Amino acid sequence: AEQTEYDPSKVSDSLKAIFQFGSTSTKQALNANTVTLITGTIGGTYVQFGADLASVLDDGNKLRVLPIVGRGSVQSVADILFLQGVDLGVVRADTLDYLERKGFAKDIKKQFTYVTKLYNEEMQMIAPKSIASMKDLNGKRVSVDLPNGGTFVTALTVFERLGIKPQVLYIEQRIAMEKLKKGELDAVIVTGGKPYKSVSNFKNDGRFHLASVEWAK
């Protein structure tokens, strides 16, 4: 069969842009139609959603979304406000409420434009089977991830509303899971979209379970 050779420049706007690097109009057009989206940490749901949005919304040089790996919901708030080149961010709904309630920022919600809800997140607690529910966490060593993410915000809010007073520790999730297995922690709180990799990849030897979270209270 006869093969037909195609000129890549005729079918690829990207190639046209690359090889017209000297064109001021090309530079302006690329920058005008590109937005950056700060997401979350590697392995989290935000990163995957960022990649999915970039793929679904891609419209050649008319619209391009560039997802950026971030540090978590709280850090993303600061990045959107202050970091040069960041246009959008994925932020947990309760993060802005927490920052205002605790006096970190006044009227911070007025500094943002809400775009859309992406999905629901779940709060899960991995613990030894001796811990049946959150009410058993008083005085226990509980990891709530690092303080620049959103997990600690959700966890501390739930603890306050339920009147629970654990020993809160800020440990990166993968490290926290290992400490839990070694008996150095009593529970690990995870908040994210389902399925969350740190939960689904957790190698349970039968000693641990997803303990109950009493939302009704």
Where are the model-predicted features located?
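Bilobed "Venus flytrap"/periplasmic-binding protein-like clamshell domains
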Residues: 32-59, 65, 120-182
